[in-house]
Regions:
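A short, conserved alpha-helix within the catalytic core of class I
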Residues: 139-150
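Conserved beta-strand signature within the Rossmann-like core of class I S-adenosyl-L-methionine
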Residues: 156-165
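A conserved beta-strand element that flanks and buttresses the S-adenosyl-L-methionine
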Residues: 131
Length: 233
């Protein structure tokens, strides 16, 4: 069962990405001109997406994949172009609709289903692979690990995901963000060190069935995120 904290943060994220930041997110994930700061975020996200996809087989034909927190669908579409049958889920109806439009505009025959919903939803089905790029970073470490636990029950081979690394800059941004009125601020990120995350994964029992694999940090301007790989033993 989702905690009260998880549900409250989920609602906050949905409101922010579906209303407050939908236009900005649409621009960020396109080729549209953006500010210098957002250009660094775009480059960082591109590098992270490449990292996560490179941790999966180059040929995904015959494989199933869930993109948990798909946003505007860039990663889901790239996975489908490599042959995967993809289910992509996001809390924001606005971003999901944009993802569907971008898929149609490609005019390619790709097996992607975009769904509005919660990545913890057990009714989404079972998959060979799960990708959660920057979709856990707004939850505290306990809720993030519980989300991985829920997803793990449905995943046969591998999960790749990101978390916000605990750095002095991110800690300062996290503290400063809380000074703004709630209506004016984005959902805060929840930085965590790799060591603390590893302890939580072990305490949750995930490491009994899953092997902690590769780990890689992307640090480009204002984009800072850390990728981790879990492979079923």
């Amino acid at each position: 069962m989702a905690s009260v904290g998880y549900q409250a943060r989920r609602d906050e994220i949905e409101t922010y990405f579906d209303r407050t930041a939908a236009d900005a997110w649409a621009a960020l994930t396109s080729d549209a001109p953006v500010s210098r700061i957002r250009r660094t975020v775009r480059r960082g996200r591109d590098a992270m997406r490449d990292t996560l996809l490179n941790w999966l087989p180059a040929d995904l034909t015959g494989s199933t994949l869930i993109d948990a927190g798909c946003g505007t669908g860039t990663l889901a579409i790239e996975a489908a172009q490599r042959g995967a049958e993809v289910v992509a889920v996001d809390l924001s109806p606005t971003l999901v609709n944009l993802a569907r439009e971008r898929l149609r505009d490609l005019n390619q025959t790709l097996d992607v289903t975009f769904i509005v919903g919660d990545m913890r939803d057990m009714d989404l089905g079972s998959f060979d692979y799960a990708v959660a790029m920057d979709s856990l970073i707004h939850y505290d470490v306990a809720d993030g690990v519980q989300t991985l636990e829920a997803m793990a029950q449905q995943i046969h081979r591998k999960m790749v995901f990101t978390f916000a690394p605990k750095t002095p800059l991110l800690a300062l941004m996290h503290a400063t963000g809380r000074l703004f009125p709630r209506a004016d601020r984005a959902p805060s990120i929840e930085p965590v060190s790799p060591e603390r995350l590893a302890r939580h994964l072990k305490e949750a029992g995930l490491t009994q069935e899953w092997l902690v694999g590769r780990s890689h940090r992307i640090d480009v301007g204002f984009y800072k995120s850390h990728a981790m790989e879990l492979t079923r033993k």
